[in-house]
Amino acid sequence: MSKKVVRILRLLIELRYKYLFQFSIVIVERGSKLEVGENTKIIKSKIVVKNRHNLQIGNSCIIKKCTLSFYSDNGWRESSIGSNGNFNGVYLQAYGSFKCGDWNIFEQKSNTPMLTVFNGSLDIGHHNRFMNRFRIRYNANVRIGNYNNINERSWLRADEQITMKDYNQISYNVMIWDTNTHNIYTPSKRRELTEKYYPFFGYEYEKPSTKPVKIGSDCWIAQNAAILKGTELEDEVIVGFCTILLGTSIPFGTTVVNKVEYRFV
């Protein structure tokens, strides 16, 4: 029997046929588990659960026009979506643990993968709304509390740890990064990596410099702000438009803005 025939037979065995009536493809590999709660609708979506991963989806969720992929890696084997969740147009790749509580909204506004979890965990509370991107690598952890809102084109990127408490408002195009994202190699080393991994540019084989980012509760972060590695915001902090914070601690109730200087010519 050819490998192609074996793959087709395996797909037919792993396919959950009842979701075809909702124009969806749901594939659960042997050894993996998927539990779906009552009154949950999976519409025009694709869900894949592989590598002995266990996924639980709560009651009364709506998953529409999504591609959700769950794989086990580096010891992470469990993911869960709480009840009354709403996923609209979301592209999720989870090679780790993705867990969110009840009443969370995920709305993707671009074709770029919204949620990418490599060898790490994303743990979310309840009653949040996300329209941003996540990228988690190197077994990093992201913890987000309750009643937070993060708008379009914002980006949380973790190679170590990002924590955010409750009732925060994050505007558009905000960068929250705990990492340098890349290492600086010698020109000869970078050329070697470029040639070896072409057409994948900027390949990394080791974790760059990182330091945790902590955001308290009731903070407001304005458009185009950057909260970079080692930054800590206590409760009720306001970060102004285009403000850049790196490795600093902002005390309770403070408003921080960039220095503005005018030049008259």
Mark where each language-model region is.
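Domain-scale signature associated with acetyltransferase and cell-envelope carbohydrate enzymes
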Residues: M1-D178, N183-I184, Y205-E236, T243-V265
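Flexible internal linker/loop segments at domain or repeat junctions
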Residues: S188-S209
